[in-house]
Amino acid sequence: MSASHSALVPAWLTAPAEANELVASVWPSSAHRVADGSVEVGGVSVFDLRDRFGTPLYVLDEDEVRAHARRARAAFDAAAARHGIRAHVYYAGKAFLSTEVVRWVVDEGLAVDVCTRGELEVALAAGADPARLGFHGNNKSVSELERAVEVGIGSVVVDSPIEIERLAAIAERRGAVQSVLVRVRTGVHAETHAFLATAHEDQKFGFSLEGAAEAVARIRELSSLRFVGLHAHIGSQIFDSSGFRESAARLVDLHADLLAGGEIPLLNVGGGFGISYTSVDDPKPIEEIAGGIVDAIADECAVRGIPMPDVATEPGRVIVGQAGITLYEVGTVKTVTAGEDLDRTYVSVDGGMSDNARPALYGADFSARLVSRTSPATPALSRVVGHHCESGDIVVDAEYLPGDVTPGDLLAVPATGAYCFSLASNYNYTPRPPVVAVRDGRARVIVHGESIDDLLARDAGIPASAPTKTPHGDTE
């Protein structure tokens, strides 16, 4: 049996003639090979990145982030303009948040969506206008809500009856009237991983359709709260607008019923727009998705003879995902017999599930390329794994890499701009890597990496006077 037809190889993965191509739909648009076969991103060599900042290393292409932010805003603005309404595009900060990224997306005209006190403080530290922040979360604490009202946050997406009462009391004490949206479970089952689907009934977020109507009625009774719209988020890594259209129909039904109680200026359809992680992933263009969503809302409003509200959306992954790569150095390489006389090469790198939890958490597929050189070697079925003491520490489950990959080579995994840094951990006492932004041939740290000393400093059993000897990896 050939490897290309074995159980070791996903149905979508085929053996290439050579394993050097950087697939355009997966990599940042600035990524390319230079004369010696190595890769540059944002005009910066992977060798320079390694030498200055070490590995593993998160690399984020600033121009790519900005371009995707502009594209998302333009897509929804154009779709909304066709129907004489406005679009409000919020960057979903949970995908990747730092002060610099907040500044980039705000520069490009986006508002920002946060879901914890920490994310709120990052956005504020970046200089974001609180009035252009939205606050999500199924279990916001009293202190989180106090802080949100204190700074004048634009909107709070309420998620439970308890939160409504809690927020109303806080706003009343402060003499404020807080704008709120009500998060709704529309019952739409998104075509995605179970942990990424968020609008079906049996999960922690939001109100049922019936419960949402009761929540709105209660909010309208409270003088310290202002109901401004409904919100629904059907999931993440979704490739077309069909699920959004179905969700929109149910939202508009509820919206129409609620109009009897007063004007409702906004309908927020959430985010979750997918990107390509491998060469076979084929998400619809954001322009097509935006048009499908907004047109669906327009159609549903027309059927019911009601005015169309403004539309809000919350893209995250589609803004930063393709803009990021993670750079690793190969440590060991070994080939094992995986059954039926089939071999698999295990390529171990100096990172792993501590810097990319998505394969372990969601079974997510990624791709990888040798980026320190090209190779004429026959591609070999490979699995890229990390250095952690865990069998599930898999970075790329199945990939064809050159058969001559060797210790010291540099590998890069593309499309790691979203939910890699955000989900990073210190598993096995591993310091989290720095994040470096590249643009126009220059690289700069936007999030400092951790050192062993940083981790040891949290251990209360170590005397404060103990010497420290381990430097940060991001020395510039």
Write out the residue ranges for each language-model feature.
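Conserved, mostly hydrophobic/aromatic
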Residues: 65, 94, 116, 148, ...
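A charged N-terminal "starter" segment
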Residues: 1-178, 222, 226, 441-476
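Charged (often Lys/Glu-rich) extended helix/loop segments that serve as interaction or gating elements
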Residues: 298, 302, 306-476
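Active-site loop/helix belt of alpha/beta enzymes
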Residues: 2-22, 81, 186-337, 401, ...
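Active-site beta-loop-alpha junctions enriched in small/polar residues
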Residues: 92-98, 117-118, 138-140, 159-161, ...
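Structural preference for beta-strand elements that scaffold enzyme active sites
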Residues: 88-90, 109-111, 130-134, 155, ...
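General structural feature for long, well-ordered alpha-helical segments within catalytic domains
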Residues: 45, 61-64, 68, 72, ...
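Short acidic, glycine/serine/threonine-rich loops at helix termini
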Residues: 101-102, 125-126, 145-150, 167-170, ...
